[in-house]
Amino acid sequence: MRFSRVFCSGILLVAFMGCGVTAPAQVGESIRITFLDVGQGDAVLIRSPEGQTALVDAGWSSPVTSLRALDVDELDLLVATHPHADHIGGMVDVINSIPVHFYMDNGQTHTTATYEGLASTLQQRTDITYLIAEPRSISLGSVEIEVLPLLPVASTDFNNRSIGLVVRYGDFSAFLSGDSEVEELSSWVRRGVVPDVTVLKAPHHGSYNGFTSEFLADAEPEVVAISVGSNTYGHPHTEALEAYTYAAETVLRTDLDGQITIVGYEDGRYEVVLGEEVTAMEQGRSGGLGVVGMRYIYE
């Protein structure tokens, strides 16, 4: 791709993204991670307490309507974890509809019309700065996004070169990894880069080859979110569901629960919101699990 490329350290990227001029997060502010209901695909929106946003993947078709409903009027960062259509199919419409400042992928190319359309669009957009996925830390306001090392595999093994991201806001954290399979997950375990996390996006839509017991033991998620829709692959597989149910307190699925939003607080507390978010319920939390409509509060 011939659009603007930048290969920089995390410190330099902070300056590029304007994090030095954003107001610090205040007590009680939160990160929001929303798993958009895009059917059999992935699209995850990260919003920092300061209002900066990152979209990780964009589903088969355009998620713009959902992003507009969430008041997203620009994206600081757009990430394609790997070049499969159920992850990049909606990106052209996102790029053409919403200002995007930075775009990151793993450097793999594909021969599909979907990928070639995305590449052509990006070539024409010199206003979007390109970032190659390599170990780095990206600051999205007070949220830190760690990019994990990619597995050196064959150029046609797209799933096992999915970009892995660890998202942190204080004691709250999330792990996102596209369609990573056993080989890539095991590599991260061996490298010791899988931390305890609050939220895990199930790799590869809950596939039988999208988890290992060692990976789940390291991650120790409290919530597993499975982005999945009608499919002929059997996702999520029974083995994966059993493993997630054993490992985590809560397992959620976009095909059953709709859009899933995790509201995370700096002290590690979090709330789960299913469907459209009810912003009026931000105050008045009490100990234990509270339920108001479709808002579930964990402390």
Predicted segments with their positions:
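Non-globular, low-confidence helical/coil segments that flank catalytic cores
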Residues: 2-5, 13-299
